Amino acid sequence: MSPITLRIVIFLVLLAHGIGHSMAFFPAWGISSTENWHHRSWLLTPLIGDKASRVINTILFLAAFLGFIGSAIGLMGWLVPHDLWRPLAIPSAVISLVALFLFWNSFVAFFPNKIGAIAVNLAVLVCLLYLNWPTETDIGY
């Protein structure tokens, strides 16, 4: 695979993963909500209440959304310095995992998507922290 092709594939994965986090905004912001798609946390809502849970939902999912979008465009060197794509992707993956854990029951209808999101988060962490992949040469920098 050529470096530009690999860079585009990683860009699309990070971008799609980031956009996927926007699904949490709809119920948290009152745009759409059902019994199987809401902003309540199985752990936090009983402890701190509905409003605080909504705020934490928004903060976590918005941080992951912005972090992955920033990482994707940084990877390409658009608007965000290229050197920041890794430092944005790593905490975004951790934040996403925390958000998915805390709000696991919030998106019952999206169960396969949650499994995919966990897989992408773990892939980001393993590739960037453990394997140190991709190298700058691998992605054409």
Feature locations, PLM:
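Membrane-interface extramembranous regions
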Residues: 2-141
